[in-house]
Structure formats: C-alpha cells, structure tokens
UniProtKB/Swiss-Prot annotation:
Participates in chromosomal partition during cell division. May act via the formation of a condensin-like complex containing Smc and ScpB that pull DNA away from mid-cell into both cell halves. One of its GO terms (cellular component) is cytoplasm. It is found in: Cytoplasm. It comes from the Bacteria. This is Segregation and condensation protein A. The gene is scpA. The lineage of its organism: Bacteria, Bacillati, Mycoplasmatota, Mycoplasmoidales, Mycoplasmoidaceae. Component of a cohesin-like complex composed of ScpA, ScpB and the Smc homodimer, in which ScpA and ScpB bind to the head domain of Smc. The presence of the three proteins is required for the association of the complex with DNA. Disulfide bonds: none annotated. InterPro entries: ScpA (IPR003768).
Length: 291
C-alpha cells in the first residue's frame, strides 16, 4: 500500500513532467489566455503580479493557484484535469504545513528545503523564458547563412510557442550545446569531403528535412538500445549520410535535440574532462518504474 501511495505522490522535482507534449489543456476560451501545464500557470500567476521569486510568499501564490482552479478550470468541459488537480492538492498540503505553527527544527528545515526547490525551479523557468527569443533569433541568423531556410513564418512562430509553453530547459547552457555541434560539424566535414567526391554523392534537398524528420531519425537510432545508453555527438553525427551532411541539417538537428530533451526522450551530459556532449537515451517506462 505504501508503495502505491509513493508512486502517486506529487513532488516538486516532478514539475517538469506536467508540461510535456502529451498533456495539453487549453483554457483560452474562458480566460483569454492559454496554459499547457500546471507549472506554467503557477509561474504566470507570479509573473503577472511582479513578485520577487527569491522572496516569494508561497502561501499567497498557492492560494492564487487554487482560486484560479476554482474560478476557471471547473467551468470547462475537460476530460482530464488530473495534473492540475494533483498539483492543487499538493499545494494545499504545503500551504497547511506553512500556516500551522511548527516547533520542530527538523520540520522547519524540511519546509525550507521544499521552498528552495520551488524557487530553484522557478528561476530555471524564468531563465528559459528569457533565452528562448535569443535562441530563435540565433537560429534564424544561422539559417540565413546556410542553405535556403525551410521554416515559414508560421512554422517559426509555432516552434517558438512550442518551446515557450514548456518549462523544461537542458541542464547545460544552450550556447555550449550549439558550439559543441559546430565543432563536430567542422571536424567531420573535412573527413566526409575527402572520403567521397562530391560528384559521386546524390545530394538530398535539405530544405525538405523537417525537425520532426530529425527527431524520428534520432529516436529510431536509439530504439534498440537500453535505458541510459549514451553516445557522443561526434559518434552519432559521423553516421549521418554524406548526402545529408550540411550546415542546414545541423541547425535542424540542434532544434530537434532540444525538442527531444524537452519531451523527456533524451538527456544531455558533458564530461568535465573535455567538451564532448553525450546524448543519453531515456526510456520513460523504465524511468517511471524507478520512482
């Protein structure tokens, strides 16, 4: 019985899982706004009131969240409110703990740890929201330098919204990931050019390669391997066919990797001893059984 209860328990470290692409609840019809996960709603309530995240009053924000749920979400015809209500239940529990006086030093420390987890998560989310426009601007600038850009204006807006609607951000700086891919490209491009004369290569129109295509390629490559299998950027991309090997392909691959990280299909790791970045396969079924 205890094991089942533990599996259903909502924890701050699991917040990112509530904003994945498999769970989209739109409340735009009633409020004029749209939230695709409870943590995004939680963060928006803080941002709209211009609260200082480092000095946030969790009791106040929790009440705002619960009030919002009562005022709007219960009026909608939505089949699945589990994640929103689960978080509301957890937040109410945290609120009651903070309101009730505590004489136990250990309990007070536990409350502080919980609060620190929320603050850390909110700071990461805030940083991600601020860096997304810069990231997209950088990608557009690089695309203009490479082959003819494939993304229409609507596609770019859709991609931007897709990133903004999710709270997850890779543990390492996005510039670090991009620079690592650039180094891999520069190292491999010479080898591939000397190995196969261009005249003998049937070129693929990379303007037709989408982010979804590259996502699928990566997932199909990782499919036979077990949970937490890892492969370096270098080892993965050296298997890319010569006819696809272009700068434009790497730009698309960069975004595809971020999307896969965001959706929880892979993680990225970097060795402290060098600049190699590894793609780590995440098997969600195996991972869920570990909690």
């Amino acid at each position: 019985m205890n094991d089942n209860n533990n599996n259903n328990e909502f924890k701050p470290e699991n917040l990112e899982s509530l904003n994945n692409t498999e769970f989209h609840i739109s409340i735009k019809d009633i409020t004029g706004k749209e939230f695709n996960g409870p943590f995004e709603l939680f963060y928006s309530l803080i941002k709209e009131r211009k609260m200082d995240i480092l000095n946030i009053n969790l009791v106040e924000v929790i009440q705002l969240y619960v009030d919002y749920i009562n005022n709007y979400l219960t009026k909608l015809k939505i089949d699945d409110l589990t994640e929103y209500l689960l978080m509301a239940t957890y937040l109410l529990e945290q609120k009651s703990k903070r309101i009730l006086p505590s004489m136990d030093t250990e309990e007070k420390i536990s409350k502080d740890i919980e609060r620190d987890k929320y603050i850390q998560r909110l700071l990461v989310y805030k940083q991600y929201q601020e860096i997304v426009p810069k990231l997209m601007e950088k990608l557009e600038r690089r695309s203009r330098m490479f082959e003819k850009p494939t993304q229409s204006g609507e596609d770019k807006e859709s991609l931007l919204k897709e990133f903004q609607d999710n709270s997850y951000v890779p543990a390492m700086d996005l510039d670090v990931i991009l620079k690592a891919m650039q180094k891999v490209y520069l190292k491999l491009v010479t080898t591939k050019k000397t190995k196969s004369p261009k005249d003998n290569v049937k070129l693929i129109d990379v303007s037709e390669i989408s982010i979804d295509d590259v996502e699928k390629e990566i997932r199909e490559f990782l499919e036979p391997f077990p949970h937490l299998y890892k492969i370096s950027f270098m080892d993965y991309f050296k298997n890319i066919p010569d006819e696809k090997f272009t700068k434009r392909y790497f730009v698309v691959a960069f975004v595809a990797i971020l999307v896969l990280v965001r959706n929880g299909h892979i993680q990225l790791e970097q060795n402290s001893s060098d600049e190699n970045i590894f793609i780590v396969k995440i098997d969600k079924e195996v991972e869920s059984n570990e909690y």
